[in-house]
Amino acid sequence: MNDKAKSILDIRQILGLLPHRYPFLLVDRVLDYTPGECITAVKNVTMNEPFFQGHFPDVPVMPGVLIMEALAQAGGILVVKSTDTSVEGKLFLFTGMERVRFRKPVYPGDRLELHCRLLRHKLKLWKMEGKAYVDGQLAAEAEMTAAVMNREDM
């Protein structure tokens, strides 16, 4: 897709694009995207998240690795919407993360806004910059590399 189409995707549409399901689906809505360029998505963080039972019971904080996973899932949606190939039988897998920084804790009740920008794409590899914000403040950032793989090759 080379057009500059912009759209909003709800949870039903996201379920059709990502293989993740509860409790590991970490994108609730896509606010905006431009194929081949960028995406803005949202994860609404609630006290009902299963990870808050142990991280940490008295001071619940969203684990940083799950913030990275939420960014990766948003990036996966961007990849799917940026290609003409079917997602049927494919998985989007992390191959690396660089310059990972956690700037602000994420708590129950926060709305995590996920921004991913495509840096480059070559063959099956996609490199993106991801930034997660809460109330306009940077909570986490990273450069992420992922590969699109066929399920039967795994």
From Swiss-Prot:
One of its GO terms (cellular component) is membrane. The keyword Phosphoprotein does not apply. It catalyses: a (3R)-hydroxyacyl-[ACP] = a (2E)-enoyl-[ACP] + H2O. GO terms for molecular function: (3R)-hydroxyacyl-[acyl-carrier-protein] dehydratase activity. Pfam families: FabA (PF07977). Its EC number is 4.2.1.59. Keywords: Cytoplasm, Lipid A biosynthesis, Lipid biosynthesis, Lipid metabolism, Lyase. Its main location: cytoplasm. SUPFAM superfamilies: Thioesterase/thiol ester dehydrase-isomerase. The active site is at H55. CDD domains: FabZ. GO terms for biological process: fatty acid biosynthetic process; lipid A biosynthetic process. InterPro entries: FabA_FabZ (IPR013114), FabZ (IPR010084), HotDog_dom_sf (IPR029069). It is found in: Cytoplasm. Involved in unsaturated fatty acids biosynthesis. Catalyzes the dehydration of short chain beta-hydroxyacyl-ACPs and long chain saturated and unsaturated beta-hydroxyacyl-ACPs. Belongs to the thioester dehydratase family. FabZ subfamily. This is 3-hydroxyacyl-[acyl-carrier-protein] dehydratase FabZ. It comes from Oleidesulfovibrio alaskensis (strain ATCC BAA-1058 / DSM 17464 / G20) (Desulfovibrio alaskensis). The lineage of its organism: Bacteria, Pseudomonadati, Thermodesulfobacteriota, Desulfovibrionia, Desulfovibrionales.
